[in-house]
A protein has these predicted regions:
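Active-site lining segments of carbohydrate-active enzymes
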Residues: 178-252, 260, 264-267, 283, ...
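Sec-dependent signal peptide recognition
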Residues: 2-10
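C-terminal beta-strand-rich structural cap/linker in extracellular carbohydrate-active enzymes
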Residues: 523-570
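Well-ordered alpha-helical scaffold segments within catalytic/enzyme domains
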Residues: 33, 37-40, 108-125, 169-187, ...
Length: 571
């Protein structure tokens, strides 16, 4: 009798779970154009790739042509300490200890690699303190007093947009704040973080809702215009940093600044997307709506992120397409350049805000799960070991990558005359164009983009069902409140599938699905089988089995920890 009751109870749980989701799922038109199940399907082990990248690239004794990829810059800019330099691209002639006094290295590369490694469990303070070295990018010598893409103006014109291309000046501050979240006790970081937030707050006050500028001079505190497009999506970068500062330090000024910058972004009359910052606006919209009861238009910001409709930065967004039997959908970059040109770093970094966004608005669970499956599948093709040789510009030179460095991009038709007859998709990179006639062919391999692999590596795990991923919604949800383990699962198949989800041993949990608004399993101590309907999703939260459930406004909590931000939406 008892056995029958247990079996019946489990059966009812599965029935309840496979019913129509009570949180209505929203669409994103661009993602609707992507395949539910991309082909050929193969999800590589991004965590292992991130671990291998760190071990291989941060080897000062590495042998081989163009190796090692790191050096020590002893110029002591901004702080009396050395800083590690990381090549932007393989063989880049601008870089290394003997070029430009060893000073030309980019925060996008070093901060991205530091963050990526940390997210997969590597302590970047061991041996050398690579974390503390990042302080050298804090440009106090110029009185800008923010993190910048280089350590000083002496190398500004070599590339990387220093002091003239707004996203290049703002994005390193997001990277720094993410690293700060992971290393909160690093000496000097708190003061730097507050100084950056103060600068961004003051800039937002001066801008007063108008972000239609090419860059902002954070020394003179004046917005500037040059030949580069206006970049109003920088408001998303300001807002993300300011909200992170608010969560960290509790100063209402920072919240006010975040809301102001986000409102400026939302008020844009046309798609303001420029490079990488727009998805942070979508994430912040969902999060602030959930945490503060605001009504920011998350749907509009997600459409802007994906749909490829910006005018000045023409076509920038998510790519869609099957090129000669290879799905490249989900990669981010230009949707129009030579038929479409997706970039590795942009694709990796889009997951940083978009995946944790689902915690705060589970109505996007299915569509974001679908995008992530496409992006995770397509991103392997940036790597020469996974892209067929006939679709690469320099497969004969791939050995130099040591299996951890990818091409910078994937393009429909190569922009290089000598490769224009290759069939799409074509893996290539822009490195040779940066220093014409000097940068080698191998500079098509992107060290800077490859260093961000830890973002994917920290989020993506395969399940027992090929094609259904487990996506960790917490790893890149920086400066978040306490949360229980939370995962997104998307079923790309036209039939229901049963997925085995594991829990920590010796800890009994109840499993709650924020999409259906019910507990789907109780007192689980090892694993549980979860049924997911066709083309549906689940956001599973693993809460203490003996936890006390309470409600606050439209939130459901267990032991005073928010589990569902939108509980009252469920009918």
């Amino acid at each position: 009798m008892n056995v029958f009751i247990k079996i019946t109870f489990s059966f009812l749980l599965l029935l309840n779970f496979s019913a129509t989701a009570q949180i209505k799922q929203q669409n994103i038109a661009r993602i609707d154009q992507m395949p539910d199940l991309p082909k050929p399907l193969q999800i590589i082990d991004y965590k292992k790739l991130a671990l291998d990248f760190d071990k291989t690239v941060y080897d000062f004794k590495a042998k081989g042509k163009f190796w090692p990829m790191v050096w020590i810059d002893t110029s002591q800019k901004n702080f009396p300490q050395p800083v590690v330099g990381l090549y932007t691209a393989v063989g880049d002639v601008r870089q290394g200890s003997n070029r430009n006094k060893g000073m030309f290295h980019e925060a996008l590369a070093t901060m991205g690699a530091t963050l990526g490694a940390t997210l997969v469990g590597i302590d970047k303070k061991q041996h050398f303190n690579y974390v503390g070295m990042l302080k050298n990018y804090f440009n106090k010598g110029t009185n800008w007093n923010i993190m910048m893409n280089n350590t000083c103006p002496e190398v500004a014109l070599l590339g990387g947009g220093y002091g003239r291309d707004w996203w290049y000046d703002v994005y390193p501050n997001l990277l720094f704040y993410a690293v700060y979240d992971q290393y909160p006790n690093e000496p000097g970081f708190e003061e730097i973080a507050k100084t950056i937030a103060d600068k961004f707050y003051e800039a937002d006050v001066i801008l007063n809702g108008n972000y239609e500028y090419s860059y902002f001079d954070y020394n003179t505190m004046k917005p500037m215009t040059n030949h580069i497009c206006a970049q109003p999506d920088v408001a998303a970068g300001h807002a993300w940093v300011l909200y992170s500062a608010y969560k960290k330090f509790g100063d209402q000024k920072y919240l006010k600044g975040a809301l102001s910058a986000l409102s400026a972004l939302e008020a844009q009359p046309k798609n303001p997307t420029y490079e990488v910052l727009m998805p942070f606006g979508a994430y912040l919209s969902a999060r602030i709506n959930a945490e503060h009861g605001t009504k920011y238009n998350t749907a509009k910001m997600l459409d802007w992120t994906f749909d490829g409709t910006p005018v000045c930065r023409e076509g920038w967004g998510a790519l869609v397409g099957n090129w000669n039997g290879i799905d490249i959908s989900g990669t981010f970059g230009s949707t129009v350049d030579h038929g479409g040109y997706g970039f590795l770093m942009n694709t990796y970094d889009a997951a940083w805000p978009l995946i944790p966004m689902v915690r705060y608005d589970q109505s996007y669970a299915t569509v974001i799960g679908k995008w992530m499956l496409n992006a995770a599948n397509a991103s392997r093709f940036f790597y020469p070991q996974y892209m067929p040789d006939q679709h690469e510009t320099i497969p004969e030179l791939a050995e130099v990558t040591k299996g951890v460095i990818a091409y910078e991009g994937i393009i429909k038709q190569s922009g290089y005359k000598e490769y224009e007859n290759l069939k799409a998709p074509v893996a290539q990179g822009d490195g040779p164009l940066w220093v014409l006639g000097e940068n080698p062919k191998e500079s098509q391999f992107s060290v800077y983009g490859s260093g961000h692999v830890g973002i994917f590596g920290s989020i993506i795990r395969e399940t027992n069902v090929k094609g259904i991923l487990q996506l960790n919604l917490l790893t890149t949800d920086f400066f978040s409140d306490k949360a229980y383990p939370t995962y997104l699962y998307y079923n790309p198949f036209t039939t229901a599938k049963t997925v085995t989800v594991a829990t920590k041993k010796a800890e009994k949990v109840n499993i709650y699905n924020t999409v259906s608004g019910i507990f789907i399993a109780r007192n689980v101590s090892v694993s549980s089988k979860i049924k997911i309907d066709a083309l549906d999703s689940a956001v599973l939260v693993f809460v203490p089995a003996d936890g006390k459930i309470t409600y606050q406004d439209n939130k459901m909590l267990v032991n005073n920890v928010i589990v569902d931000y939108n509980f009252q939406q469920i009918k």
